[in-house]
Design a protein with these regions (language model features):
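Charge-dense, helix-prone N-terminal extensions
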Residues: 1-168
Length: 168
C-alpha cells in the first residue's frame, strides 16, 4: 500500500512540562527556579561569612545539610578561611585567592576545586563551564560526603595560589 501524500509538513508536538506544587510532592520544599534549570542561584555577590551563611540557609534540604557540612569542614580544616558569595555559589579561600566553591542544584550540591586536576587523587567530576582544570564532587546526600577525602583536597588546594590571588 503506497504512503499517503499530504501537502502539509508534519509539525513536531511540543508539550509543556506539568507544573507541580509542593503539596503534590511528598512534603518536600519547592525548589527555586535556578536549581531546577541547573543554573547557580541568583544570590548577590558579597564577601564575608554572613552572606555565605544566608546563602546556605536559603537552600532547601538536603542541599542545605550538605552545604552546612562542607562549610563546617572547611572552617575546621583551613585556618584563616575567607568566605564569599560569587556567581550564585559560596566561594572559599585562604590567603590570596579562591580555592573551591559550593553551590546547591536540583538533586545535588556541587563542590568544585579550582585547579582540581592537580589534586591527588583527582576528584571525579569535571564540571561544564568552570574551567579546564576544575574538578569536584556532586554529593546528593550528607551520607555521600567522604569528609576525610574532602578535607585532604581542601588542604591540597589551599596550598597553591587560588583564583584571583598572587603567585606564591
Amino acid at each position: 500500500m503506497p504512503a499517503r501524500k499530504t501537502d502539509k509538513p508534519s509539525k513536531p508536538t511540543v508539550r509543556k512540562p506539568a507544573e507541580r506544587t509542593a503539596a503534590e510532592g511528598k512534603g518536600s520544599a519547592t525548589l527555586p527556579d535556578t536549581m531546577i534549570t541547573g543554573k547557580a542561584s541568583s544570590a548577590k555577590a558579597a564577601d564575608g561569612d554572613k552572606p555565605v551563611f544566608a546563602y546556605i540557609a536559603s537552600l532547601p534540604q538536603p542541599q542545605r545539610g550538605i552545604a552546612e557540612r562542607i562549610d563546617a569542614l572547611a572552617a575546621k580544616t583551613l585556618p584563616g578561611l575567607q568566605r564569599s558569595v560569587k556567581w550564585g555559589m559560596s566561594y572559599y579561600g585562604v590567603g590570596d585567592g579562591w580555592c573551591f566553591c559550593c553551590g546547591g542544584f536540583a538533586g545535588h550540591v556541587k563542590l568544585m576545586f579550582v585547579n582540581g586536576a592537580a589534586l591527588v587523587p583527582v576528584p571525579p567530576v569535571t564540571p561544564v563551564g568552570m574551567g579546564k582544570s576544575t574538578r569536584g564532587v556532586e554529593p546528593e546526600s550528607v551520607a555521600d560526603l567522604d569528609e576525610r577525602q574532602i578535607a585532604e583536597w581542601m588542604k591540597q588546594v589551599a596550598a597553591v595560589p587560588g583564583v584571583g590571588g598572587k603567585k606564591r
